[in-house]
């Protein structure tokens, strides 16, 4: 769509061009189609009522006079014709070939479809009728904000490109720097460019708390800020004078021997900028996600790099049969041990692992391999750091966050966003857009969503499934509406993008489309499954209840897709245990070599490790996730390098002498064919390729025909496949009859007991199993199999 804008003349700060002897100056500003700021005034409560009123009051925007003020990146700048702005379309964008995507995008209009009535959720689940007032209020608030954004910001598409207005943006004339800091009394740009002189480049403030300065190019036409220069903003605030990294900074680094990070003006020469060459893959029918962390992805005890990950780790992910890689800790975080979850610089990729161009080359290589790249994005909270983060940015307790106790997460020691604030919406929506647009990520896994959606943050609360727990006074409606907006934005502009939410509460409508009245995620993490396996592993498997296992795996809301997992990075952290460690414990260190006799503990552990993973994939959801190394039972936990620490509670936690020894992944163990880890890895690979071939996770047909408690046998159908699990510790069953829906001949397509997978080769793979015209377990046909103890076998009809 195109929208019209009107002109205005305002005042602003400008620095005289360097090397010209110029002095104080002023600029004429003109109004453009990209509105600058809205409704975030000093002392504003941040509620949507005040936010909307402030938005309506805004009628002018400040930008320096000139042809281009960085309104669009130089790669795909939208041109102004008269007073109309044509917004390019993403719906048919590709990244194949240098510049192809940008050229195509210029010829199309990007649109986020308008809201509907949001009533379909009541047809999908009539039980929601009892909570119609809450849900309709939620949807009306979403519609109102969409309307305000359309009216005052030119729509979600323009609003989410605010990174082209805030922070540093280069134009043909120079560089404009803008920052929202309503609490500051004065502000100045400081850094290498002016020898950190706070009097050299003072900024001016408008009525909405936005500070700004325009730096003209040098007399010789060169940039007023050289690429790679250190930059900060010095502000006189209610808390005193402080230097802060710009909130919208695109890159930051930690100088050797220093603790706080420095912001870096990042604008490399054209010949250095990475050009994407490969098209982004289409969204697969089912997701098989390999969860990763770049820094700890090396077998060596060190911080790994984007480049090494690109060259060494991506090919192994492809070989293993996964079709998506989820990368943690991309957003800059000054504390490495936070696993990337205490974000300090939201628009900056972590410099520990390399440069932004290195990250782009990683993503492009993944696309070449046909892998989706999902980013583990953190919008649920922010680091409490004041030196290099957003906390206390303008010297106030509020700014981007709630004030008082509501703005502090007592368990995570982090700050909590005020999602009812207009500028918070601008910042976070633009942040999501930035990673998709600039780096070509294919979607997000949103971290800590439960903490966002409830004022109790899901802490010390047990969710029982009662709808009052989801649609009551404990629900942070502003946060839920933000999630609706960000999903609306992502799916409207990038239809192939994937969004996954980490929600432990099971909120109804969470994974239903926004236009139907839902929150809008494509998937929710099926977090109860991993918890169930840990509970079971604390017991003897002789006591496991088959019906209990099946219930946990299949306990999902209709039409709301799930990504399931037996374990993720959470279980691999120090203080917890992986499934392999629960099963085999210290025996893993002494009895995993094939030239040494095994033990009953190892035999049991390897067998159950394979069974747990396959039944989780088979019944647990429409997507599957594995954390790197767990596919082969990685024997070491994760312990980031750290010194001693005293928590706010007063509890003392000893350090590990800043060692990297347990902060790595020993892929060499899974690759070593003389170790039993190799067989476990081979099974996981076969499991992924089986799903790739048969797409059973997303099959419309699922039928669980047997949950036999005495036999410890589970039998179910997914598509045309028949899965047989025998969890009994001793009993193997000959001529065991199982039901099926199709007549014919069945063959083995996956056998956990195969010698290749570290099993005992008790199944004859060449055997053909002919169905009988006799019903069994409420199935019209049946056939007989041999099912050894602690095995899982998958049968498929012979073509």
UniProtKB/Swiss-Prot annotation:
Annotated catalysed reactions: Transfers a segment of a (1->4)-alpha-D-glucan chain to a primary hydroxy group in a similar glucan chain
Any one GO biological process = starch metabolic process
| Boundaries of the annotated transit peptide in chain numbering | 1-57
The UniProt entry, under Pfam families, shows:
Alpha-amylase (PF00128), Alpha-amylase_C (PF02806), CBM_48 (PF02922)
Q: Major location, coarse class?
A: plastid
The site (Transition state stabilizer) lies at 570
Pathway note: Glycan biosynthesis; starch biosynthesis
Family matches, as InterPro entries: A-amylase/branching_C, Branching_enzy, Glyco_hydro_13_cat_dom, Glyco_hydro_13_N, Glyco_hydro_b, Glycoside_hydrolase_SF, Ig-like_fold, Ig_E-set
Record keywords: Chloroplast included?
A: yes
List the active site. 447, 502
Residue positions binding (1,4-alpha-D-glucosyl)n: 196, 232
Q: Which UniProt keywords apply?
A: Amyloplast, Chloroplast, Glycosyltransferase, Plastid, Starch biosynthesis, Transferase, Transit peptide
Q: Where in the cell is it found?
A: Plastid, Chloroplast; Plastid, Amyloplast
Query: How would you classify this enzyme at the top EC level?
Result: transferase
Family note: Belongs to the glycosyl hydrolase 13 family. GlgB subfamily.
How it assembles, according to the record, is: Monomer.
According to UniProt, the name of this protein is 1,4-alpha-glucan-branching enzyme 2, chloroplastic/amyloplastic
């Amino acid at each position: 769509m195109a929208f019209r804008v009107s002109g205005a003349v305002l005042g602003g700060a400008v620095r005289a061009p360097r090397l010209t002897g110029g002095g104080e100056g002023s600029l004429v500003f003109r109004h453009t189609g990209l509105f600058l700021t809205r409704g975030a005034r000093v002392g504003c409560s941040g509620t949507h009522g005040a936010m909307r009123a402030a938005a309506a009051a805004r009628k002018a925007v400040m930008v320096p006079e000139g042809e281009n003020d960085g309104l669009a990146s130089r790669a795909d700048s939208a041109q102004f014709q008269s007073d109309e702005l044509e917004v390019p379309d993403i719906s048919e964008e590709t990244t194949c070939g240098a510049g192809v995507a940008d050229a195509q995008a210029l010829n199309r209009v990007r649109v986020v479809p308008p809201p509907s009535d949001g009533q379909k959720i009541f047809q999908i689940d009539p039980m929601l009728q009892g909570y119609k007032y809450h849900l309709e209020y939620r949807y009306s608030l979403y519609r109102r904000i969409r309307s305000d954004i359309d009216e005052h910001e030119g729509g979600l598409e323009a609003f989410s490109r605010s990174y082209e207005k805030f922070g540093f943006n280069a134009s043909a004339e120079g560089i404009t720097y803008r920052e929202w800091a309503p609490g500051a009394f004065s502000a100045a740009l400081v850094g290498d460019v002016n020898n950190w002189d706070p009097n050299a480049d003072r900024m001016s403030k408008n009525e909405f708390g936005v500070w700004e300065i325009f730096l003209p190019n040098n007399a010789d036409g060169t940039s007023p800020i050289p690429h790679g220069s250190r930059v900060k903003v010095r502000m006189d605030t209610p808390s005193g004078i402080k230097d802060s990294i710009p909130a919208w900074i695109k890159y930051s680094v930690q100088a050797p021997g220093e603790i706080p990070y420095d912001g870096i003006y990042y604008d490399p020469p054209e010949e250095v900028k990475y050009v994407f060459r490969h098209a982004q893959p289409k969204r697969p029918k089912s997701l098989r996600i390999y969860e990763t962390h770049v820094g700890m992805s090396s077998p060596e005890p060190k911080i790994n790099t984007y480049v090494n990950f690109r060259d060494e780790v991506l090919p192994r992910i492809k070989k293993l049969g996964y079709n998506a890689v989820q990368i943690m800790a991309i957003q800059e975080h000054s504390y490495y041990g936070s696993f990337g979850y205490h974000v300090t610089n939201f628009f900056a990729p972590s410099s520990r692992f390399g440069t932004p161009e290195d990250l782009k080359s990683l993503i492009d290589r993944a696309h070449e391999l046909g892998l989706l790249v999902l980013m583990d994005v953190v919008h649920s909270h922010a680091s409490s750091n004041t030196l290099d983060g957003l906390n206390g940015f303008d010297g106030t307790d509020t700014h981007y966050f709630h004030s008082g106790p509501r703005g502090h997460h007592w368990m995570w020691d982090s700050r909590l966003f005020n999602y009812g604030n207009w500028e918070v919406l601008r910042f976070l929506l633009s942040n999501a857009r930035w990673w998709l647009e600039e780096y070509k990520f294919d979607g997000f896994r949103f971290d800590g969503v439960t903490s966002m959606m409830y004022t109790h943050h899901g802490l010390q609360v047990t969710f029982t499934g009662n709808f009052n727990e989801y649609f009551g006074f404990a629900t942070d409606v502003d946060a839920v509406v933000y999630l609706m907006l960000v999903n609306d934005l992502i799916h409207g502009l990038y239809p192939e993008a994937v969004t996954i939410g980490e929600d432990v509460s099971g909120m109804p409508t969470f994974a239903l489309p926004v236009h139907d009245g839902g929150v809008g995620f494509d998937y929710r993490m099926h977090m109860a499954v991993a918890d169930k396996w840990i509970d079971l592993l604390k017991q003897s498997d002789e006591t496991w209840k088959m019906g209990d296992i099946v219930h946990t795996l299949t306990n999902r809301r209709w039409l709301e897709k799930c990504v399931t997992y037996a374990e993720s990075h959470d279980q691999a952290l120090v203080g917890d245990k992986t499934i392999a460690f629960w099963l085999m414990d210290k025996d893993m260190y002494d009895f995993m070599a094939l030239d040494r006799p095994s033990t009953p503990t190892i035999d049991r552990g390897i067998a159950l490790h394979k069974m747990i993973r396959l039944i989780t994939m088979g019944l647990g959801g429409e997507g599957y996730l594995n954390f790197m190394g767990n596919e082969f039972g990685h024997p070491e936990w994760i312990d980031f390098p750290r010194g001693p620490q005293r928590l706010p509670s007063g509890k003392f936690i000893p350090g590990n002498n800043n060692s990297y020894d347990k902060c790595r992944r020993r892929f060499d163990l899974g690759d070593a064919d003389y170790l039993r880890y190799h067989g476990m890895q081979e099974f996981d690979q076969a499991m992924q390729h089986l799903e790739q071939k048969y797409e059973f996770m997303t099959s419309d047909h699922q039928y669980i025909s047997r949950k036999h408690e005495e036999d410890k046998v589970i039998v179910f159908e997914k598509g045309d496949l028949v899965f047989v699990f025998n969890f009994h510790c001793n009993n193997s069953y000959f001529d065991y009859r199982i039901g099926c829906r199709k007549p014919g001949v069945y063959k083995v397509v996956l056998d956990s007991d195969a010698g290749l997978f570290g099993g005992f080769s008790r199944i004859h793979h060449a055997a053909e199993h002919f169905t009988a015209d006799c019903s069994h377990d409420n199935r019209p046909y049946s056939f007989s199999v041999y099912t050894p103890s602690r095995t899982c076998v998958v049968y498929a009809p012979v073509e």
